[in-house]
Amino acid sequence: MMNRCNIVLFAISLLFSSSLIAGTIDVTKRGAKGDGVTDNTIIIQKAVDECSKKGGGTVLIPSGSYLIRPIELKSNVNLHLDFGTLLLGSTRLSDYDNAFPFKDGSMNQSSGLLFARGQKNISITGFGTIDGQGGNKTFQFGNDADGGPKRPKIIYFVECKGIVVTDVTLRNSAYWVQHYEKCEDVTIRGLKVFSHCNYNNDGLDIDAKNATISDCYIDVEDDAICFKSDHPE
């Protein structure tokens, strides 16, 4: 009887493990190269799209250095960065062209390396690092109060619900490090944020409902945390 129980439990554990594996896409298995030079944007974006289309899952980025242009996160997708993973943002300003209109007709001019709009249940987890390379001369054109082109953020989520960002390290943003605008149910925990490479290097700008921020270390050039209320609704 005991042997039968053990066999049943083992079979259940195998089934559970298989379901986890089935719901995870390792981007290196799709051709991504962590050499710090290869542009991995298309491969990672396709993995995000596939996970979301199937109802959800994890996009796993193993240890290595991955150059990317902006990646759009989508509903029910967890972007997981292994320990030793480094995402490097493109240093071409022309790559950050994801402006869009708000519902009131005004135009948003900002952009983000990892961005989402109108999505649900999105997360960024793991102990990897995201480096915006914001100290590059491409992004050195002064304080935003002086006008001129808009510099990109590292994380920019707009009108999203159910956001979890935990444990990752964020560094060297060209502008604000992260911005959660018109979002709801936001959990930010255990982040390490370092950015002294450009003007207006806020660590965290938040304009959201039901947000919890805890256990973060923020060392930046401008405001560590900036609470905003730009949208009365």
Identify the residue ranges that each predicted region occupies:
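Short intrinsically disordered, low-complexity coil segments enriched in acidic
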Residues: 1, 13-15, 225
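Bacterial N-terminal signal peptides that target proteins for export
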Residues: 1-9
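Bacterial N-terminal signal peptides
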Residues: 9-19
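Extracellular/periplasmic carbohydrate-active domains that bind, remodel
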Residues: 21-233
